[in-house]
């Protein structure tokens, strides 16, 4: 999965989001690799109106069943072996309203990366018969305020299976975010449950994460 859209080489702002919040872990200000911490209780998302502006995104790293972690490398979201020197990508999850939401499928959420500057998106490219997973330059907090028709390709149902989570596209039911059994391959989507694809993930909360000031709504 790679960046799409105009100005894909966008540069991140130099300022960090300074919103006060409890610090239950330490971060190296120099940006040293993060070490995944122990599994914590799974977050509970609620159906929330997209007009709510004071809702803070949940922050976590994502790990698959093969002990791989998702990282962002040169605009590509890939799964690599979870080593101490690897810095996982920090995902920002925000509850999203959906008129046709099904409680059986899970909680609808939006997923952002790169400090909330890019969002995960599942849709079909022109001429393609199957959807693909992409990163689009959409600010997470602004996306949350858009109409449902514009948000739908960005919405994923988060279903909890014990301590694991599955992410199903709201725009393309039956298609789940997946990783390959091989290392260093792009994250994608699949509609097939097979041994060579992992669709269940562990979400490990991050206590404090950077986010561009422009992403914070008053």
Swiss-Prot record:
Protein's cellular compartments: Cytoplasm, Cytosol; Nucleus; Secreted
Q: How does it assemble?
A: Interacts with SMAD3. Binds IL18R1, but not to IL1R1, with lower affinity than IL18, and does not seem to act as a receptor antagonist for IL18. Interacts with cargo receptor TMED10; the interaction mediates the translocation from the cytoplasm into the ERGIC (endoplasmic reticulum-Golgi intermediate compartment) and thereby secretion.
Keywords noted in UniProt: Cytokine, Cytoplasm, Disease variant, Nucleus, Secreted
Keyword Nucleus included in the entry's annotation:
yes
Record-level GO cellular component terms: cytosol; extracellular region; extracellular space; intracellular membrane-bounded organelle; nucleoplasm
**What's an example GO BP annotation here?**
cytokine-mediated signaling pathway
User: Could you describe the post-translational modifications of this protein?
Assistant: Proteolytically converted to the mature form by CASP1.
Give the residue ranges for region: Disordered.
1-40
User: What family does the entry list?
Assistant: Belongs to the IL-1 family.
**Compositionally biased residues, Basic and acidic residues:** 13-22
Q: Where is the chain membrane-spanning?
A: none
Alphabetically, the GO molecular function entries are:
cytokine activity; identical protein binding; interleukin-1 receptor binding
Q: Induced by what?
A: Highly induced by bacterial lipopolysaccharides (LPS) and TGFB1, more moderately by IFNG, IL18, IL1B, TNF and the dinucleotide CpG (at protein level). Constitutive expression in bone marrow macrophages is down-regulated in the presence of IL4 and CSF2. Induced by phorbol myristate acetate (PMA) in different cell lines.
Name of the encoding gene: IL37
* Result of altering residue 177 to T: In IBD31; decreased stability; increased degradation; decreased localization to the nucleus; decreased localization to the extracellular space; decreased function in regulation of inflammatory response
From what superkingdom does this record's organism come? Eukaryota
Q: Function of this protein?
A: Immune regulatory cytokine that acts as a suppressor of innate inflammatory and immune responses involved in curbing excessive inflammation. Signaling can occur via two mechanisms, intracellularly through nuclear translocation with SMAD3 and extracellularly after secretion and binding to its receptor composed of IL18R1 and IL18RAP. Suppresses, or reduces, pro-inflammatory cytokine production, including IL1A and IL6, as well as CCL12, CSF1, CSF2, CXCL13, IL1B, IL23A and IL1RN, but spares anti-inflammatory cytokines. Inhibits dendritic cell activation.
Look up the record and name the associated disease.
Inflammatory bowel disease 31, autosomal recessive: A form of inflammatory bowel disease, a chronic, relapsing inflammation of the gastrointestinal tract with a complex etiology and a multifactorial inheritance pattern. It is subdivided into Crohn disease and ulcerative colitis phenotypes. Crohn disease may affect any part of the gastrointestinal tract from the mouth to the anus, but most frequently it involves the terminal ileum and colon. Bowel inflammation is transmural and discontinuous; it may contain granulomas or be associated with intestinal or perianal fistulas.
User: Which residue windows are coiled coil?
Assistant: none
SUPFAM superfamilies xref list: Cytokine
Q: What is its main location?
A: cytoplasm
Question: Is Secreted there in the keyword field?
Answer: yes
Q: What name is this protein filed under?
A: Interleukin-37
Q: In which tissues is it expressed?
A: In general, low constitutive expression, if any, in healthy tissues; high expression in inflammatory counterparts, including in synovial tissues from individuals with active rheumatoid arthritis. Isoform A, isoform B and isoform C are expressed in testis, colon, placenta, lung and lymph node. Isoform D and isoform E were found only in testis and bone marrow. Whereas only isoform A is found in brain, only isoform B in kidney and only isoform C in heart.
């Amino acid at each position: 999965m790679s960046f799409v859209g105009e100005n894909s080489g966008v540069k991140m702002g130099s300022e960090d989001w300074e919103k006060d919040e409890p610090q239950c872990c330490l971060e190296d200000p120099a940006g040293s690799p993060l070490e995944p911490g122990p599994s914590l209780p799974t977050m509970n998302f609620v159906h929330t109106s997209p007009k709510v502006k004071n809702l803070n995104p949940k922050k976590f790293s994502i790990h698959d069943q093969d002990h791989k972690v998702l990282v962002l490398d040169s605009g590509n979201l890939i799964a690599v072996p979870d080593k101490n020197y690897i810095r996982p990508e920090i995902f920002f999850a925000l509850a999203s309203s959906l008129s046709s939401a099904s409680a059986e499928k899970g909680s609808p959420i939006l997923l952002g990366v790169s400090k909330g500057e890019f969002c995960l998106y599942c849709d079909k490219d022109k001429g393609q018969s199957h959807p693909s997973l992409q990163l689009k330059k959409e600010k997470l907090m602004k996306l949350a305020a858009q109409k449902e028709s514009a948000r739908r390709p960005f919405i994923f149902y988060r279903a909890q299976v014990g301590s694991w989570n599955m992410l199903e596209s709201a725009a393309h039911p039956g298609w789940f975010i997946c990783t390959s059994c091989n290392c260093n391959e792009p994250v994608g989507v699949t509609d097939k449950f097979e041994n060579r694809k992992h669709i269940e993930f562990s979400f490990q909360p991050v206590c404090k994460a950077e986010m561009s000031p422009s992403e914070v709504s008053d």
